[in-house]
Amino acid sequence: MTRFSLTVLAVLAACFGSNIRPNVATLEPKTVCYYESWVHWRQGEGKMDPEDIDTSLCTHIVYSYFGIDAATHEIKLLDEYLMKDLHDMEHFTQHKGNAKAMIAVGGSTMSDQFSKTAAVEHYRETFVVSTVDLMTRYGFDGVMIDWSGMQAKDSDNFIKLLDKFDEKFAHTSFVMGVTLPATIASYDNYNIPAISNYVDFMNVLSLDYTGSWAHTVGHASPFPEQLKTLEAYHKRGAPRHKMVMAVPFYARTWILEKMNKQDIGDKASGPGPRGQFTQTDGFLSYNELCVQIQAETNAFTITRDHDNTAIYAVYVHSNHAEWISFEDRHTLGEKAKNITQQGYAGMSVYTLSNEDVHGVCGDKNPLLHAIQSNYYHGVVTEPTVVTLPPVTHTTEHVTDIPGVFHCHEEGFFRDKTYCATYYECKKGDFGLEKTVHHCANHLQAFDEVSRTCIDHTKIPGC
């Protein structure tokens, strides 16, 4: 939690009796790492426990999620056997290192209960006191309020709830954070200037702009859209240095309607199949995806989109193709560098269990390393190089699909149909990656010899 000097604190306490957070920038970028307690129950490499967290790569680790008891309005353990009886919360705080250990209350199903609790003074008091008691008992350093789906009618009560936390946090070092949605319709439900005064940081859920619920494929978290969301909150009064940008450590996946229609905006017939660990349609954790790519490299075409700081893969089977939007260490490193340069507070990651925490594809935590190595004050460094183990390719080799360009070697190659389009093929973490480029206009064509765009009449067939 950001603090004034002792003198200023004394003046504020005398004048206001408040713990309101100042709007001054902090020096260290934040990496807010969300940990889902239920991943303890997964099997194999998908299982994760607090001891598996590398807290040197996170400034804040967030234990999620807690609820609110509908009858008593006290904070509620959602898995009491794991959290309490198996001492999972204690293990979490005991292994926090130098990171701030926080709890997250709420989530996608808690909006109605938040509304009821925040509406009554006595309920607010009960909830906040029970939360502070739990944090103190188990050694937590702060709380994230994730009131998803908050309505405009709840705006004033949300501020009253934050004010109650502020009152109980007085003379402590507890950290206060809130999560804000990325949906345009929700922006004005939040009194952003007031919220900014009460919190140390705001976690903006700048992810899942599309997914398998849509009938066309696209980047799930394109950087321009993420920045647009952050700027929308900034225009409404949120200081940049108090906003962290959420990034996914998972992929959104689709089944393509036609195998030879693989571009952004092409139609999908449904969600991609479930992963081994996460067991969710249209969703793969990074550690599920990297294992799959390494096992069947020849079946994947990976395309990098520099304009959107994005990457996607097409995985071709014998009878269908999957379209996979994901993040890698290069996209995350570039985003970390750019948001730091623009004055934002850092990133939040969703979630640690989706990272390669066990190093099944190479070095441990490649995505977190990429973020941290590109953060500080816009200083550009190369992302940490991940050493990948030798890959044993399957004997299956996917036949090129007519109308779809595939990289077979490094270099620059003109499209066979549209001469003004060309492809750059270069080695990446998982084999050859393709980047699509276009000449300035349709009267030009790409010359593979000079590697420049020239008059199309000078190239036979163009």
Swiss-Prot record:
Name the protein family. Answer: Belongs to the glycosyl hydrolase 18 family. Chitinase class II subfamily.
Q: Which residues form the GH18 domain?
A: 29-378
Q: What is its main location?
A: secreted
Q: Glycans attached where? A: 338
What does the record say about tissue specificity? Expressed in the upper digestive tract. Staining is observed in the ventriculus, and in very rare individuals, also in the intestine or esophagus. No expression in fecal pellets neither inside the rectum nor defecated outside of the body.
Q: What species is this protein from?
A: Dermatophagoides farinae
The molecular function terms in GO held by this entry are: chitin binding; chitinase activity
Show where the Chitin-binding type-2 domain sits: 404-462
Name a Pfam family for this protein: Glyco_hydro_18
Q: Which SMART domains match?
A: Glyco_18
- Report the leader peptide range: 1-25
Q: What does this protein do?
A: Probably a non-catalytic chitinase-like protein, which binds to insoluble chitin and enhances the activity of the catalytic chitinases. Has weak chitin-binding activity.
Q: What is this protein called?
A: Chitinase-like mite allergen Der f 18.0101
